[in-house]
């Protein structure tokens, strides 16, 4: 079991190398495919001879960068709620691809069958990390492009606007909701109210307990990074310039300030977070009228159910759990 947990952590550990100038060529190893603008395809539904669900694959222009994007929508002439999917840390494509897993594609397809539109976009760091350079912060990694994506959704025929953030993307969703008008609700999926450096410290300590004190030192340095102190040192794969930017966020405060309906979903089987994260959510928001908290026992960090007796199963495609899709959809539709 310990070996299995180590494999999961090595695959899924919070790594912010998307803001590092030394970036592996992720496009060669990813299942992501470059697509021309305005290419649309139908998504067939089981037992449905003619589907109203369509995908529009296009290039989203944001801050001088061209980002591949997919808008999945109901082409029936009616307004539907729409959700922006926000990926976790690292240089993710629009499907948040990891091996055979494509959680954002699965979520988009599942939500579409519930009558909910969605937009997913390559992270800027997926294609342009080297151009962004060492001084990349959450603005360059997330906020600028998410704001552009929200404006795109506002221009469509939608009846409500939601943000669904996975992992670090959940914290970003809260940050956006506290600053953007017109967001109707947010979902934080396997995310945390704790500082990212503290979570990374815990993750590394699980893998390498002998060096826990060093990891605590790194976390302290990341949390204390300021404009005056930043010199380009790296902690947990991110420069201190990045941590200066990240340190401006307060996820719990952002949720309170946004004052909109919020769904927090975590799992006790998530090896990238800890029971402490669930307990903190409950301590912060168990009495909130706007915040719903749901805890699963059997889904991984990316949402899939994994056979814990077979480590090789993480390399095999599995269906995204329908009950998690239903949790998302029911929240968005107010059911």
Functional labels for PLM-detected ranges:
Residues 271-277:
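Conserved alpha/beta-hydrolase "acid-adjacent" motif
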Residues 299-302, 307-335:
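Catalytic active-site module of serine/aspartate enzymes centered on a nucleophile-bearing elbow/loop
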Residues 43-78:
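N-terminal cap/lid segment of alpha/beta-hydrolase-fold proteins
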Residues 103-128:
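Conserved alpha/beta-hydrolase
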Residues 258, 264-266:
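Short beta-strand/loop motif that positions the catalytic acidic residue
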Residues 187-255:
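Accessory cap/linker subdomain of secreted extracellular hydrolases
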Residues 76-110:
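Short, surface-exposed "cap/lid" segments of acyl-processing enzymes
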Residues 135-155:
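Alpha/beta-hydrolase active-site loop
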């Amino acid at each position: 079991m310990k070996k299995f947990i180590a494999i999961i952590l090595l695959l899924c550990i919070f790594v912010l190398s998307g803001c590092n100038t030394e970036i592996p060529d992720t496009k060669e190893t990813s299942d992501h495919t470059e697509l021309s603008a305005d290419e649309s395809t139908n998504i067939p539904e089981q037992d449905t001879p003619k589907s109203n669900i369509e995908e529009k694959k296009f290039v989203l222009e944001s801050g001088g960068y061209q980002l591949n994007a997919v808008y999945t929508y109901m082409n029936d002439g009616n307004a539907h709620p729409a959700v922006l999917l926000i990926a976790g840390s690292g240089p993710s494509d629009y499907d948040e691809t990891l091996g055979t897993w494509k959680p954002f594609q699965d979520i988009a397809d599942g939500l579409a069958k519930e009558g909910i539109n969605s937009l997913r976009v390559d992270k800027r760091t997926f294609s342009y990390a080297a151009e962004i350079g060492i001084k990349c912060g959450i603005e360059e990694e997330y906020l600028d492009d998410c704001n552009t994506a929200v404006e795109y959704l506002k221009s469509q025929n939608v009846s409500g606007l939601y943000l669904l953030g996975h992992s670090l993307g959940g914290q970003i969703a809260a940050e956006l909701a506290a600053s953007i008008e017109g967001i109707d609700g947010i979902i934080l999926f396997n995310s945390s109210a704790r500082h990212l450096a503290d979570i990374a410290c815990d993750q590394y300590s699980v893998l390498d307990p002998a060096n826990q004190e060093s990891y605590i030192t790194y976390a302290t340095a990341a949390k204390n990074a300021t404009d005056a102190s930043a010199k380009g040192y790296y902690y947990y794969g991110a420069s201190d310039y990045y941590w200066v930017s990240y340190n401006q966020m307060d996820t719990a405060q952002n949720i309170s300030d946004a004052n909109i309906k919020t769904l927090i979903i975590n799992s006790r089987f998530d090896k990238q977070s800890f029971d402490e994260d669930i307990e903190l959510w409950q301590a912060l928001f168990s009495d909130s009228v706007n915040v719903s908290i749901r805890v699963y026992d059997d889904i991984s960090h990316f949402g899939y159910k994994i056979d814990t007796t077979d480590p090789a199963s993480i390399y095999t495609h599995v269906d995204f759990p329908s009950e998690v899709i239903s949790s998302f959809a029911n929240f968005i539709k107010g059911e």
